[in-house]
Amino acid sequence: EWEPVQNGGSSYYMVPRIWA
């Protein structure tokens, strides 16, 4: 499962849930 992570401003990137 992938979830969005805030990357500074209004942008974001997707990362595997296992990283969190």
UniProtKB/Swiss-Prot annotation:
Organism: Cullen corylifolium
One annotated GO molecular function: serine-type endopeptidase inhibitor activity
Keyword terms of this UniProt record: Antimicrobial, Fungicide, Protease inhibitor, Serine protease inhibitor
Function according to Swiss-Prot or TrEMBL: Inhibits soybean trypsin. Has antifungal activity against R.cerealis, A.brassicae and A.niger, and weak antifungal activity against F.oxysporum.
Lineage: superkingdom: Eukaryota
Similarity field: Belongs to the protease inhibitor I3 (leguminous Kunitz-type inhibitor) family.
Name the UniProt record assigns to this protein: Antifungal protein
GO BP field: defense response to fungus; killing of cells of another organism
